[in-house]
Swiss-Prot record:
Protein name: Cysteine desulfurase IscS
Compartments where found: Cytoplasm
Underlying gene: iscS
Keywords from the UniProt entry: 2Fe-2S, Cytoplasm, Iron, Iron-sulfur, Metal-binding, Pyridoxal phosphate, Transferase
GO molecular function: 2 iron, 2 sulfur cluster binding; cysteine desulfurase activity; metal ion binding; pyridoxal phosphate binding
A biological process from GO: [2Fe-2S] cluster assembly
Residues that hold [2Fe-2S] cluster according to the record: 329
Domain of life, per lineage: Bacteria
Catalytic reactions on record: (sulfur carrier)-H + L-cysteine = (sulfur carrier)-SH + L-alanine
Family (UniProt): Belongs to the class-V pyridoxal-phosphate-dependent aminotransferase family. NifS/IscS subfamily.
Active site residues according to the UniProt entry: 329 (cysteine persulfide intermediate)
Coiled coil: none
Pathway where this protein functions: Cofactor biosynthesis; iron-sulfur cluster biosynthesis
Main EC class the enzyme belongs to: transferase
Length: 405
């Protein structure tokens, strides 16, 4: 079976062969298979050494102290630990939290949970069409009892970049903790936690050619951030996250972060050319709209709405391309993307969107082929659409009164 062209790197990435090789060294009896918490013999010491080296590799990419890296099972757990951990530890200082309507579910769902525990959450509305959350919006929402602001650095559906450096200045001045979900940012944009006033940051390995099931939470040491642990049982990771450390996963994440640091800038440049080529080509079609910010973005994403085409039908027509109509965490539902709805898109436009996301194995030939098949599919589906005919005849569809069924 011929595999389709993979353009869903925002959902997950394949493990880099070099990463897989490093991981294999930590699995079998002749490798580093010991428990990093076993302090009484060489098997444990060797595993601990690998774990600590990986901690340095992750810290180096984001210019942090290795002691500020806490291993988790992924960005979802990191987000949960940051939000619930800070909220529950500092509840006596205030119960107000700020986030936005376009965060990942791994932030929004814990926020709903915290609301049930008596916290008050402000959900910021993004700028229409671009999806920007601006420092001004955050400043207007900050209060003396705001204990936490949680915003993503790069949006996972539209690729818009939030100016977290400036927002960090505002939160620090307000004595408010600032958590940033950087799952889609690491390895794509420069992160310097030695200068940014960010207190907590979530990471995932599988978004940058590392394994699934491993992530990290950066927890600032100075000024110190304290958390209420969410998983108990042994006090690993300085009491913040109990559980035997998965040496092979951790080693894989460290290696992936180191490789990302070496190739990041050249890769962004290469991918931007591919993205621009696809977007420029798609604009030959009528009624095609870019979702997200035209310039303040990372190159790996292109989210496009094709008016008068059902996104699910278009995806089914693109048999040669693996794309999505939203984040992988919500693409199992047929609801329109809540991110695109928050950008002010109509149900119709939100339903007609496709997210193309690019990565290290995407080639120019891939883009040429996907461009050809996408144009053909859109044209074919529009031929079948009575709404398209009405639009072409100059009928303003917003004024049409539809009969009730």
């Amino acid at each position: 079976m011929k595999r389709p062209i993979y353009l869903d790197y925002a959902a997950t990435t394949p493990v880099d062969p070099q990463v897989a090789e490093r991981m294999m060294e930590c699995l079998t009896f002749d490798g580093t298979f010991g428990n990093a918490a076993s302090r009484s013999h060489a098997y444990g010491w060797q595993a601990e050494e690998k774990v600590e080296y990986a901690r340095e590799q992750v810290a180096n990419l984001i210019k942090a102290d290795p002691r500020e890296i806490v291993w988790t099972s992924g960005a979802t757990e990191s987000d949960n630990l940051a939000l619930k951990g800070v909220a529950q530890f500092y509840a006596s200082k205030g119960k107000h939290i700020i986030t936005s309507k376009i965060e990942h579910k791994a932030v929004l769902d814990p926020c709903r949970e915290l609301e049930e525990q008596g916290f008050e959450i402000t959900y910021l509305e993004p700028e229409p069409q671009t999806g920007l959350i601006t420092p001004e919006m955050v400043k207007a929402a900050l209060r003396p009892d705001t204990i936490l602001v949680s915003l993503m650095m790069v949006n996972n559906e539209i690729g818009t970049v939030t100016d977290v450096a400036v927002i960090g200045e505002l939160t620090r001045a307000n004595k408010t903790f600032f958590h940033v979900d950087a799952a889609q940012a690491a390895g794509k944009v420069d992160i310097d936690l030695s200068t940014m006033k960010i207190d907590l940051m979530s990471f995932s390995a599988h978004k940058i050619y590392g394994p699934k099931g491993i992530g990290a939470l950066y927890v600032r040491r100075s000024p110190r951030v304290r958390l209420k642990a969410q998983i108990h049982g042994g006090g690993h990771e300085r009491g913040m996250r109990s559980g035997t450390l998965a040496t092979h996963q951790i080693v894989g994440m460290g290696e992936a972060f180191e490789l990302a640091g070496k190739t990041m800038h050249a890769e962004q440049e290469r991918i931007r050319k591919l993205r621009d080529k696809l977007w420029n080509g798609l604009q030959d079609l009528e009624q095609v709209f870019l979702n997200g910010h035209p310039t303040q973005n990372v190159a790996n994403y292109l989210n496009v709405s094709f008016n008068f085409v059902e996104g699910e039908s278009l995806m089914m027509s693109l048999k040669d391309a693996a794309v999505s109509s939203g984040s992988a965490c919500t693409s199992a539902t047929l609801e329109p993307s809540y991110v695109l709805r928050a950008l002010g898109l109509s149900d119709e436009l939100a339903h007609s969107s496709i997210r193309f996301s690019f990565g290290k194995y995407t080639t120019e030939e891939d883009i040429d082929h996907v461009l050809t098949i996408t144009k053909a599919a859109v044209e074919k589906l529009r031929e079948l659409s009575p709404l398209w005919d009405m639009y072409k005849e100059g009928i303003d569809l917003s004024t049409v009164e539809w009969a009730e069924h």
